[in-house]
């Protein structure tokens, strides 16, 4: 996102698309685990470039009064990715695993052509500003260790190693934040985190994505191991969630222009929490319909939450810092998803016989906490 403010969001986005497409081909052609890991790592850089400036581009494309609609359309498109298990199951039913990556190539090329043709340039670029390599390295070290520590709690890692990693994180994080506080355009947007509305939106987003991943990771195991559904049936039963999100996200975008976005996000999270609780309380032998309406309820709540929350977050930042806000949005999502996936592993370890309900109950509680935080934004202004 910092590169987007310097070079232009369009350039960073198209470079990310090109890298993602090329590395998808490399993944498909990989002949060993080592080459696949290298290709996937580079693919992650491409995906990060795309995701980090996506919201900033939306802010440029849509007038302020229609920003909610733009976010809604974007959330609709993003929700298609939640149908990944269904699409993957379909691909694997007719082909081998390399096709999971090969399918990205024509999609990436098409997106690249459209990006060159239609994406706008930044209205204002940071003149005379250089990319802070030192801050980037400190950022990677700090957040990398945070994710490693979260993962370590779910594995049999010796406590002394975890404590050592925590000490290193605190040490690096302290000096990283102190350094960024002295920068006019910090890589870690300390200036944006001083805006209460922005920070509350970030925290709400983290809680929501933790809750989402608690369901998305644990529930497929329940469908296959407990209910005995095959891969295709599992993918199809997960599909109502993204479909409901696709319907509700654009609607939330329109509603966010007419009502308080904090209220709308809070209502969405309450619905989401109810959906997770209903999944946790599934009967012992549920029918497909029992599962479908509960998944749709989760997707509906998440769709109503995501669009207005993202609109509040990006709208709270100055236009010149849209890149930093967009990057923080992606960071909040990644942090929440990482924590959620790790918590699922912890639930499997602590509650081996009831891991799925435990994960969903926890997700329901976290979604409610997110709703409380969301409602606290009602009278706040950027």
Q: How would you name each of these model-derived features?
A:
Residues 19-29, 107-114, 171-175, 247, ...:
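Transmembrane-helix signature of multi-pass solute transporters
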Residues 103, 134, 160-165, 181-381:
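12-transmembrane solute porter fold
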Residues 94-204, 211, 237, 363-364:
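Hydrophobic transmembrane-helix bundles of small-molecule transporters
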Residues 56-57, 61, 91, 118, ...:
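A residue-level signal for alpha-helical anchor/packing sites in multi-pass solute transporters
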Residues 13, 20, 36, 131, ...:
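Hydrophobic alpha-helix/TM-entry signal in multi-pass membrane transporters
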Residues 25, 48, 79-83, 140, ...:
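Hydrophobic/small/kink-forming positions within alpha-helical transmembrane segments
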Residues 76-95, 144, 148, 335-351:
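A gly/Pro-rich, aromatic-decorated transmembrane alpha-helix motif that marks the paired
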Residues 2-134, 152:
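Helix-loop-helix hairpins in multi-pass membrane proteins, especially solute transporters
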């Amino acid at each position: 996102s910092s590169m987007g403010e310097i070079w232009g969001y369009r350039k960073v986005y198209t470079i990310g698309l090109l890298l993602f497409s090329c590395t998808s081909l490399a993944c498909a052609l990989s002949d060993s685990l080592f080459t696949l890991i290298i290709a996937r790592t580079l693919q992650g850089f491409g995906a990060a470039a795309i995701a980090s400036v996506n919201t900033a581009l939306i802010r440029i494309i849509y007038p302020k009064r229609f920003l909610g609609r733009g976010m809604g359309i974007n959330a609709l498109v993003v929700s298609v990715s939640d149908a990944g298990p269904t699409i993957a199951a379909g691909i694997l039913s007719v082909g081998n695993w390399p096709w999971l990556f090969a399918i990205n190539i024509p999609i990436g090329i098409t997106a690249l052509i459209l990006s060159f043709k239609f994406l706008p340039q930044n209205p204002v670029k940071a003149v005379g500003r250089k990319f802070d390599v030192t801050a980037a390295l400190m950022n990677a070290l700090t957040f990398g260790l945070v994710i490693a520590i979260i993962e370590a709690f779910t594995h049999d890692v010796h406590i002394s190693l975890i404590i050592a990693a925590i000490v290193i994180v605190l040490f690096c994080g302290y000096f990283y934040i102190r350094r960024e506080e002295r920068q006019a355009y910090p890589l870690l947007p300390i200036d944006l985190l001083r805006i209460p509305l922005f920070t509350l939106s970030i925290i709400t987003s983290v809680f929501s994505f933790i809750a989402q991943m608690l369901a998305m990771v644990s529930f497929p195991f329940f469908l296959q191991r407990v209910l005995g559904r095959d891969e295709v049936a599992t993918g199809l039963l997960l599909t109502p969630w993204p479909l409901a999100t696709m319907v509700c996200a654009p609607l939330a975008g329109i509603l966010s222009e007419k009502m308080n976005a904090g209220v709308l996000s809070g209502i969405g999270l309450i619905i989401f929490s109810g959906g997770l609780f209903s999944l946790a309380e599934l009967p012992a032998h549920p029918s497909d319909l029992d599962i479908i309406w509960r998944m749709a309820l989760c997707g509906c709540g998440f769709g109503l939450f995501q669009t207005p929350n993202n609109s509040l977050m990006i709208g709270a930042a100055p236009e010149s810092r849209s890149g930093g806000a967009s990057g923080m949005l992606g960071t909040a999502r990644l942090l929440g998803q990482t924590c959620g996936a790790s918590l699922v592993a912890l639930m499997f370890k602590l509650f081996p016989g009831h891991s799925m309900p435990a994960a969903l109950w926890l997700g329901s509680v976290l979604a409610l906490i997110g709703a409380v935080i969301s409602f606290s934004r009602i009278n706040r202004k950027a």
